[in-house]
């Protein structure tokens, strides 16, 4: 896993993103920092616990389309590149 990550202002500097609770925004950044080089996170619940977030924040990111879930619990960040 790389040690440097970049986040696009086209994603995080929008009303749609900024209207989310700060806890959901924080989760998005932490997931991005821990994603593999293709944007996949194999243990999102571990990261939730690690930063003191909750399932509602994850649900918000999924509902708004920032994350794509897989049946095995893995998620991918949609706007990864």
Cite the ranges covered by each PLM segment.
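Detector for short helical micro-motifs
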Residues: 2-81
